[in-house]
Amino acid sequence: IRHLIRLLHAFPIPKEKEKKKDFYEQIDSALKHKKILQMYPEGSLWPYYDKVRNFKYGAFKIAASANVPIQPIRFTFVKPYGIYRLYKKKDCIEATILDPIYPNLDLDLTRRIEDLRERAYISIKVE
């Protein structure tokens, strides 16, 4: 997945307070230029972890504030199949692109963020 993330020009969310202002300015600029942003709402990706962890608010705050949809992607891990069985030892990663989720503009910003977060979590959880 690391190679896919780099290919998509992804960058980590800074933990240091002094770096966050620049980070959010880059995000605002990207959204104004209609760029696609990829974020892990859990805060980081744990390869081969098969449960959905709690989502942080940052990605949803960004989407709700900018009134842009989020595009959930569910990563699942499956045993190698087909030709992959011959040489792959670790599980294969499957990505399922789910329906986009739009912010509910009838809600105030705080509720909009929470609503977006909850709907994304529900959509990604495997039944």
Predicted regions mapped to residue ranges:
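Non-catalytic C-terminal accessory region of glycerolipid acyltransferases
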Residues: K21-E127
